UniProtKB/Swiss-Prot annotation:
The keyword Protein biosynthesis does not apply. It comes from the Bacteria. Belongs to the Syd family. It is a peripheral membrane protein. It comes from Shewanella baltica (strain OS223). Keywords: Cell inner membrane, Cell membrane, Membrane. Gene3D superfamilies: Syd protein. The gene is syd. It holds the Pfam family Syd. CDD domains: Syd. This is Protein Syd. It is found in: Cell inner membrane. GO terms for cellular component: cytoplasmic side of plasma membrane. InterPro entries: Syd, Syd_sf.
């Protein structure tokens, strides 16, 4: 079962929750990066939050280059989850705690995602661990949310370790169990990255990379 209907519904509920509770669209710190998601004026030189809404991509994002580079077939849900929309990260509440789903802010952000996905999968191979790919963060970024690439199940993963706690048998069911979390925009601290630097999708994910590479 594709996760796309669940993602579509969550995005609709997400923006409706902000409009109902705050009377405004959600806001996000783009840190100088333009996006078709931005509503209203945008000044790249001003460090301020912008109102945004998701925009369906005209051409679906592809991970064929990642698969070719790693000689690995990725679980097809990755195309539905990351390749359909431009969007800011999505905050959520759940029975497992608070967290955020990563999304792609613009085309450069998508390239950054691919580069860091390659880095993550190469690290899993180096550690002789089964391949996973990340979809978000849990508990203020202390834990990664990852997909088991062999069956599409959703797990909690700590940097450098094999996932031990399964949350859902599928990404669709996992997204369906989440509730939008209403919160003010937070400007994330910039931390060093092992691959391409980009302030969009990995503003918060950088904390995970710092922990991972600090251990090795």
């Amino acid at each position: 079962m594709s996760c796309l209907p669940a993602l579509d519904k969550f995005l609709q509920n997400y923006h409706q929750a902000y409009l109902t509770s705050l009377g405004e669209l959600p806001r996000y710190y783009p840190q100088g990066e333009a996006s078709v998601c931005i509503q209203g004026e945008f000044h790249a030189d001003l460090d301020q939050a912008v109102s945004w809404q998701p925009v369906k991509r005209e051409v679906e994002g592809s991970f064929a280059n990642v698969e070719h580079a790693l000689e690995l077939t990725l679980w097809p849900e990755i195309n539905h989850f990351y390749g359909q929309y431009f969007s800011a990260p999505l905050l959520f509440d759940s029975e497992w705690g608070t967290g955020e789903l990563l999304q792609v802010w613009n085309e450069d952000d998508f390239t950054c995602l691919q580069q860091n996905l390659i880095g993550h999968l190469m690290m899993k191979k180096k550690l002789k661990q089964p391949p996973t790919w990340f979809i978000g963060l849990l508990d203020e970024g202390d834990k990664m949310l990852t997909i088991n690439n062999s069956d599409g199940s959703v797990w909690i993963e700590l940097p450098g370790e094999i996932p031990t706690q399964q949350l859902s048998p599928s990404l669709a069911e996992f997204i369906g169990a989440l509730s939008p979390r209403i919160a003010p925009p937070v400007k994330h601290e910039e931390l060093p990255m092992p691959a391409l630097e980009h302030p969009g999708i990995f503003a918060s994910f950088k904390r995970m990379w710092q922990n991972l590479f600090g251990k090795r």
